[in-house]
């Protein structure tokens, strides 16, 4: 019997991801462009293209460009040894930061990066000289979009919000859903439904499991 899934909050805005969070697991698998700064022995078989049947050794040469998942790039990055350097994704570079500072609401964040804030926060791990600008841009983008998101969640009761939600990153979608739930709870309170006691999902699921066990 399937169990209810209780969403675990993301930890990506902090120093480390929360690997009990599905959002963080998905975010940590997004690809990041890197360049090797030293040869990497015995790793070529895993990362280099073997098409064409070319014979190569198992080392990744210095200067090789790779697409690595975020979790692996973080694990290999070391300031002291300079194992690899990271190329900032375009959406975090100066050109896009200028767009965000002009009007962050015009950008389809989900299309550009479904975990825009979480992924951007984890990029600060790589000690780029642009880190201060990136963190400032992330904060200002969130502030610039927050009011519209919450206003829409509070003024779109029983309306089709799919077009708006489709443009939000995953964290923004969570905020929108929270706003919608608050509005729905308020509407229930106004109708006098808030005083009605209902069993929690945990109790209902437990009762279903117990009934199923009795049938078996």
From Swiss-Prot:
One Gene Ontology cellular component: CMG complex
Gene3D superfamilies: 1.20.58.2050
Pfam families: PSF3_N (PF22466), Sld5 (PF05916)
Keyword Ribonucleoprotein part of the UniProt annotation: no
Keywords, comma-separated and alphabetical: Chromosome, DNA replication, Nucleus
One GO process term, biological-process aspect: multicellular organism growth
Protein name: DNA replication complex GINS protein PSF3
Species of origin: Bos taurus (Bovine)
Keyword Nucleus: yes
Family: Belongs to the GINS3/PSF3 family.
Domain of life of the native organism: Eukaryota
Location of the region described as Not essential for folding and stability of GINS complex, but may regulate accessibility to the central complex pore in the Swiss-Prot/TrEMBL record: 1-16
UniProt-listed InterPro entries: GINS_A, GINS_bundle-like_dom_sf, GINS_Psf3, GINS_Psf3_sf, PSF3_N
Localization, UniProt: Nucleus; Chromosome
Job description of the protein: Required for correct functioning of the GINS complex, a complex that plays an essential role in the initiation of DNA replication, and progression of DNA replication forks. GINS complex is a core component of CDC45-MCM-GINS (CMG) helicase, the molecular machine that unwinds template DNA during replication, and around which the replisome is built.
Quaternary assembly: Component of the GINS complex which is a heterotetramer of GINS1, GINS2, GINS3 and GINS4. Forms a stable subcomplex with GINS2. GINS complex interacts with DNA primase in vitro. Component of the CMG helicase complex, a hexameric ring of related MCM2-7 subunits stabilized by CDC45 and the tetrameric GINS complex.
